[in-house]
Structure formats: structure tokens, C-alpha cells
Amino acid sequence: MSADRHVRQPAMPCAASACIGADVAGLALAPATEPSLFVAANVADGIASTIGDIRDFATVRDAIARHRPQVIIHLAAQPLVSKSFADPIETFATNALGTAHVLEAARLTPDVKAVVCITTDKVYRDQDWVWGYREQDPLGGKDPYSASKACAELVAASYRATLAERGNGVLISNARGGNIIGGGDWSADRIVPDFVRAVTGRLPISLRNPGAVRPWQHVMALVHGYLVLAARLVAGDRAAADNWNFGPSDDAARNVQDLVERLGASWTRPEIIYASGSFPETRFLHLESTKARSLLSWTPPLSFAETVDLTASWYRDFSANPADASQITLRQIEHYRDAVRTHGTR
């Protein structure tokens, strides 16, 4: 199913720094990194942007009431495992209570028809197995980040089951994505931004868990899935108001070392230093996404190699010409659309 018909609906992503689309209003914190894709690509020029914190309910309520969106894509989060250990209170307040703020404001705003809550592949209880996690597997979370996102899932489930019908009847879904890579991320303690900083600064890269297996996935594949899901909700498909895994094909579940080696082959290979991790991490993490493939007709068209090469290409081109961030991004969006048209699902 194409998301193109949906993109013209009035929409409001919470965490607008992460969104592409049309007719968009956004609520997000001020950019926290330098550089920032939101600034470099002049994202604010194309949307109605509100700088605010979802931990403040009045801010969320007022922004949603002012813009009256039909669709809310809730991306706002404290997304870093490392920071969740340093500041667990902020992590739980943002990820769990912030989700409640978004959903409470959504159900009290008559125009809102759909909310897609973006969580993570880390919401599942760690079974230390090689199989992909399915939507019905138990939630869990040993580290504060994973636990806070599992809490957000329960908040959304409560609103979906009972509170939405006591408001405007908004349809609510949870979308659980794989490990996201792609251009424009400069966060700390993430493998691709760390790789880019190592290459551009001519520094070594430190790998904490080179054997950890993750479902690497391009950000555009996830945006594609979120828009397809949102389109179903806006159309009134109550069956879509559920939990959904959006994971890559099996070949994309590779370890950290594989990712770094492919990035190096696509650009430049920095010196690698192996270091012990300062916090526990899951050894194997993979999503089973048959449900989205079968019922939403969604499958990402990019292989692991294509995903990594496209990511390296974005950063390489940006490093050569930072002023061209918007055009680099638009070219890659068109590349992804061409891949969908050419390959369809696979």
C-alpha cells in the first residue's frame, strides 16, 4: 500500500526534527546536536514548528489544539541507552509520561483521527535467543531506556482500550522499529555517528560490543511503514489500531563489526579499538515483521548492503558540502521511492 495518498492530510509529528512530509506542524525540543539535520536542511522552512517539551502537558495540549491535526506521529523520546543510565528520571518522564501527555491531548482534540506511537525493538523482554521477536511476545526492559519504552507501550494500550472511546474515538497504534541508521544523525554513543566522527576527525572508533546482532534498517524504510500505518488509521481501519513490528529482512540482522566493515568499504575504514561496555546490552535482537508484510503490504526494498551504502553516501556528501544537506536528503528520498517502485516488496 502506498502512503502517498495520506501525506497531504494535516499531520503533527512530536519530534519534528525527525519528520519528512507535507502539511506538517511539529513539536520538538530545540536541536541538541551540532550539526543538526533540522538546521542544516532548513526543515523549519517547510513546517509550522513549535519548540517545546512533551513533559509539559500544557505545551502539548496547546500545540495540538492550535494545529488541529488529523494524524499525530509520536516520535519524541529520550532515545539513548547511555543517557538513560545517567538520567533515568528524565528518561521515564519523557518516554512514559510524555506519551500519556500526547495521547491525552489527542483524545481531547476533535480533529485527531489517528496516533502512531513510535517505540523500539528494545521493548521486548530479553530472551537471549536468535529468533525474531513477535508482537505478542512479553514486554520487558532491563535498562531504563528499554523499560521506559515498554511503559510507553502500556500507556498507549490503555488509551487504545479504554480512554480513546471516552474522548474523540481516536485510533492508536504502536510501531516498533529496528535499529535505525541513515543520514543526519549526530547523536552521541551511536555507532554510525561515532563512525562518521572517527572518519572525519581521523580518529579511531571504539566498539563496545562488536558481536552484538541488531536489525539494521534505513530510516526511510521506517518512515514508509509509519505512513502506511497512519493511512490505514485515518481511513478508519480499526484492525490497524494495534502493535506492529517494522523490521528489516533477515539478511540485515548483522553484528556491529559487520556494520562498521561495510561502512568502511563504502567510505573509509578507521582504526578500530575494542573496549568493554559500561552497561549491559542484548546480544541478539531481531524483529519478526510478518504481520506488517502480510497485512500492510510493507517490506523495505533495500538490502543490508544498500542500506549501509546509502547511509555512508549521505555523510560523505554532507562532509564535502554541508550547505547541500537539504538536496542530499531529497535525492536519497527519491532514491528510496525509486527502489520501492522497482523492487516492490522482497
Regions found by a protein language model. Name each.
Residues 1-177, 181, 335-336:
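N-terminal Rossmann-like NAD(P)+-binding domain of SDR-like oxidoreductases, especially those catalyzing
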Residues 9-26, 52, 179, 199-346:
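C-terminal substrate-binding subdomain of Rossmann-fold SDR/epimerase-dehydratase oxidoreductases
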Residues 36-39, 127-130, 185-188, 219-220, ...:
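Short aromatic-enriched loop/helix-cap "lid" or pocket-rim segments at secondary-structure transitions
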Residues 57-58, 70, 82, 89, ...:
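Residues in well-ordered alpha-helical elements
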Residues 130, 141-148, 188, 192, ...:
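The catalytic Tyr-centered alpha-helix of NAD(P)H-dependent dehydrogenases
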Residues 151, 155-159, 195, 259, ...:
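Hydrophobic alpha-helix immediately C-terminal to the catalytic Tyr-X-X-X-Lys motif of short-chain
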